[in-house]
Regions:
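Flexible, glycine-/charge-rich segments associated with ATP-binding catalytic modules
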Residues: 2-69, 283-448
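Amphipathic alpha-helical interaction surfaces in cytosolic regulatory modules
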Residues: 71-166
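Short acidic, S/G/P-rich loop/turn micro-motifs used as interaction or catalytic elements
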Residues: 77-82, 110-118, 278-279, 329-332, ...
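Conserved short strand/loop->alpha-helix "switch" segment adjacent to the catalytic nucleotide/phosphoryl-transfer site
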Residues: 114, 118, 215-238
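Conserved ATP-binding N-box helix of the HATPase_c
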Residues: 126, 160, 227-263, 341-353
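Internal, well-ordered alpha/beta segment that forms a basic, Gly-enriched binding/recognition surface
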Residues: 159-206
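ATP-dependent phospho-/nucleotidyl transfer catalytic cores
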Residues: 195-224
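ATP-lid-like helix-loop hinge signature
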Residues: 243-291, 360-363, 408-413
Length: 448
């Protein structure tokens, strides 16, 4: 039976209205995207502020070779294992780019044998910023390079390294090559629009997604975060990212995670870094009568009075170390304030990871914090201890007191070398022989 003319016209009008509304939504979406790009372009400016920050920290005199810019990644490229060499490579690249109009850049990884996620992430970000800068000018930089020889490192460069960061389509690994690899990569760019205030803020959503990534890595090897540990990790990753926004004076941070299950001893790697003021610079800028400065000044005065400060142990190194202790934050105004626990909680998380890994792996878990020109290494030898009431302390000396100088093998001054911000780099091995959940032992009651 044919549809009556009136009904047919009604359905036709309804389809037209739906199509019209769809076109209107699409037009509004394109307009919003165009406006967002315009605003982001204005905020970014003509030159990358991050590349400028890094370039300003480089004291070496550099000349651009006639053959063009070339970055030679060293055999050990790691914030954990060799921060000096890693920083020199990164800062030199930034300065070369800032002082010259680069048309081609070669990044040679062929010598790289040992690396960590953090060093590569910062180097890749410089390349990414230069690529964005070139697009702003309507030009282009051609990037090319050489892969590392070890297969797992080539996979690393493809899955989370320069290939991914620059979206080099013809070098993207196949699904078979990516099988067994877990990647997490989020960045808050300083030139992007603020998120919709009606939605959960970006850093909170990133913290939740990151904890899901870590849990996935652990699940691959018969481990798991307990519900209590999931909650804790979300909270203090959120606080660490919050610190990056609140203290540095420049809202640009990155958090990455990587796991390659195809290697003999899979290593779970974490990199968190931000740009802006270092930890020591933030504390140095506090008023003398502020609560936090009164809280920490006794340590500074004691080291000054005992003439402990010297070339390898400076006031800024002490301030960086003090900031790792419980309840120390430039944002605290009284004893009732509880900011400053994020890094302490991260150290405790690392200690639990270290204990788990030490049971069944020949590889040791390690963590490093690099802020400004101070590098602090964690490998399980020195531990955070003390009561929640009096505050937890890790002083990196036998007495575990901040009134004495720390072990220079663990708390190092990098001299004139400086990173404009803070980097946290963590790596720990995973295996299938342990099923104890991280965070709360299965044989212990949940105290949360």
């Amino acid at each position: 039976m044919p549809i009556p003319l009136a009904v047919d016209q009604l359905l036709s009008d309804k389809r037209l209205r739906k199509a019209s509304r769809r076109r209107w939504r699409e037009m509004k979406g394109r307009a919003r995207l165009a406006e967002q790009r315009r605003v982001n372009k204005l905020r970014f400016g003509d030159y990358s502020r991050i590349v400028r920050m890094l370039a300003d920290c480089c004291t070496a005199d550099l000349k651009l070779p006639r053959t063009g810019a070339k970055v030679v990644v060293p055999p050990t490229f790691s914030i954990i294992d060799d921060p000096v060499t890693a920083l020199q490579v990164i800062l030199s690249f930034a300065k070369l780019a800032r002082e010259n109009r680069l048309r081609t850049v070669e990044i040679d990884h062929s010598r790289m044998q040992v690396c960590d996620l953090a060093a590569n992430a910062v180097l890749d970000l410089v390349a990414s910023e230069l690529s964005t800068e070139a697009r702003q000018r309507g030009s282009k930089i051609r990037f090319f390079g050489r892969y590392p020889i070890p297969t797992h490192l080539k996979r690393f460069v493809q899955c989370i390294g320069i290939v991914k960061q620059l979206s080099i389509a013809h070098e993207v690994p196949s699904p078979e090559e990516k099988n067994g690899v877990r990647v997490f990569d989020k960045r808050k760019r300083h030139y992007h629009d603020p998120v919709d205030p009606t939605q959960a803020d970006f850093k909170s959503r990133v913290a939740v997604d990151f904890v899901d990534h870590i849990n996935g890595c652990l699940n691959d090897h018969g481990r798991a975060l307990t519900p209590a540990a999931v909650h804790k990790l979300c909270v203090y990753i959120g606080e660490i990212l919050g610190n990056a926004e609140d203290h540095a004076g420049f809202e640009d941070w990155t958090i990455q995670g990587y796991l390659d299950n195809a290697v003999n001893t899979p290593m779970c790697e974490i990199a968190i870094f931000n740009f802006g003021a270092s930890i020591a610079e933030t504390l140095t800028g506090l008023p003398a009568d502020s609560y936090t400065w009164r809280q920490i000044s006794s340590y500074v005065l004691m080291h000054r009075g005992a003439k402990l400060f010297r070339a390898g142990w400076r006031e800024r190194d002490l301030l960086t170390l003090i900031a790792l202790q419980g309840n120390v934050s430039s944002k605290n105004r009284s004893e009732k304030d509880t900011r400053g626990q994020g890094t302490v909680d991260l150290i405790e998380f690392f200690q639990k990871v270290y204990e788990e890994c030490a049971k069944d792996s020949g590889e040791a878990a390690k963590m490093a914090i690099l802020s400004g020109s101070t590098h602090i290494l964690f490998d399980g030898k020195y531990r955070l201890s003390g009561s929640p009431e009096r505050g937890k302390v890790i002083a990196f000396n036998a007495e575990n007191t901040l009134y004495k100088q720390p072990d220079s093998s663990y708390v190092k001054s990098l001299g004139t070398l400086k990173f404009p911000g803070t980097i946290i780099s963590i790596r720990f091995p995973l295996s299938t022989t342990s099923t104890v959940a991280l965070g709360v032992n299965r044989n212990e009651p949940n105290r949360d």
